[in-house]
């Protein structure tokens, strides 16, 4: 007969059986391997030898070093002026007033004063350009005027920049990007001549500009077409007489400068310009007060009997 098992041993055997039935968990041991890297260099902090810029400049002078001062100002280039120094006022009627009248005497006196001021400006221009001759300038100005306007026909803006100033360029090329310009010079009705010469400085006394106003009475043709080829302004085969007062400018202190067209003076007594033709609407039939549009359109479509 078997001997009875004590109660304590039965509980122990039961616990060991449950523990052996559990799945075995395999664990991996983590190994830390040190990696040798490049040692970083941290520069030491040194105290500045010179606390102020003045001490540094004094030490540099003692050592024989000349340090140029740093300029924080930005340089700008002024190739032209933004307007006219002393705008020439064309006399009303283009100086056709009799010199014996009161108005004629006043006009003649003012003209003499302006002539004296022009002579002073001519001498100042010759100080910078010894080859300048006022008698040869009107012909040169006419060539610049013609070539500048011909550049608009083929949209040669690179050449136009050399013939007109930066002030005049936007005025000539404004609103013609998608348009066709047909301009031509026919003839000169009167010889061009200089009516006023002025010189002035800008920003400082060393930046001198010269402006010459030339009177031109010519015959020209002008026609402007829109991007669809429809005529907007003028006619190519109808020449017109044009009286213009053109201002030419040059930066006298620039040894490579040249005379360029700057602006035009429009007198207040000049006739108004021809308005631009609007081609966006087709005009309909003229209606009477008692008619309607449909009735007038039906009558226009009726065949006419012989």
Swiss-Prot record:
Region listing for Disordered, in residue ranges: 287-306
Principal subcellular localisation of the protein: mitochondrion
Cellular compartments per GO CC: mitochondrial inner membrane; mitochondrial large ribosomal subunit; mitochondrion
Coiled coil regions, renumbered to chain: none
Pfam families for this protein: Tim44 (PF04280)
GO molecular function: RNA binding; structural constituent of ribosome
SMART domains: Tim44 (SM00978)
GO biological process: mitochondrial translation
Annotated localization: Mitochondrion
SUPFAM superfamilies: NTF2-like
Keywords assigned by UniProt, alphabetized: Mitochondrion, Ribonucleoprotein, Ribosomal protein, Transit peptide
Subunit structure: Component of the mitochondrial large ribosomal subunit (mt-LSU). Mature mammalian 55S mitochondrial ribosomes consist of a small (28S) and a large (39S) subunit. The 28S small subunit contains a 12S ribosomal RNA (12S mt-rRNA) and 30 different proteins. The 39S large subunit contains a 16S rRNA (16S mt-rRNA), a copy of mitochondrial valine transfer RNA (mt-tRNA(Val)), which plays an integral structural role, and 52 different proteins.
Function of the molecule: Component of the mitochondrial large ribosomal subunit (mt-LSU). Within the mitochondrial ribosomes, required to direct the nascent polypeptide toward the tunnel exit and position the exit at a distance from the membrane surface.
The family this protein is said to belong to: Belongs to the mitochondrion-specific ribosomal protein mL45 family.
Protein name: Large ribosomal subunit protein mL45
The gene coding this protein: MRPL45
């Amino acid at each position: 007969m078997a001997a009875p098992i004590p109660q304590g041993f039965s509980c122990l055997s039961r616990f060991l059986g449950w523990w052996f039935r559990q799945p075995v968990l395999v664990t991996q041991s983590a190994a830390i391997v040190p990696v040798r890297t490049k040692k970083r260099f941290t520069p030491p902090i040194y105290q500045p030898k010179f606390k102020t810029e003045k001490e540094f400049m004094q030490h540099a002078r003692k050592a024989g070093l000349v340090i140029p001062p740093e300029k924080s100002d930005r340089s700008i280039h002024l190739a032209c002026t933004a307007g006219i120094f002393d705008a020439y006022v064309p006399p009303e009627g283009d100086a056709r007033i009799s010199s014996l009248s009161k108005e004629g005497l006043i006009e003649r006196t003012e003209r003499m004063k302006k002539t004296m001021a022009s002579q002073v400006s001519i001498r100042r221009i010759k100080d910078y350009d010894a080859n300048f001759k006022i008698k040869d300038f009107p012909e040169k100005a006419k060539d610049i005027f013609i070539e500048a306007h011909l550049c608009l026909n083929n949209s040669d803006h690179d050449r136009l920049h050399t013939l007109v100033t930066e002030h005049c360029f936007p005025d000539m090329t404004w609103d013609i990007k998608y348009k066709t310009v047909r301009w031509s010079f026919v003839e000169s009705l009167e010889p061009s001549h200089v009516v006023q010469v002025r010189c002035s400085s800008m920003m400082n006394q060393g930046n001198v500009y010269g402006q010459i106003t030339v009177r031109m009475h010519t015959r020209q043709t002008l026609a402007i077409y829109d991007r669809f080829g429809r005529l907007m302004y003028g006619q190519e085969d109808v020449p017109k007489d044009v009286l213009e007062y053109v201002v030419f400018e040059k930066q006298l202190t620039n040894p490579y400068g040249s005379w360029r067209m700057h602006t035009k003076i429009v007198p207040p007594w000049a006739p108004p310009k021809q308005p631009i033709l609007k081609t966006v609407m087709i005009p309909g039939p003229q209606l009477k007060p008692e008619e309607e549009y449909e009735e007038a359109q039906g009558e226009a479509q009726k065949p006419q009997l012989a």
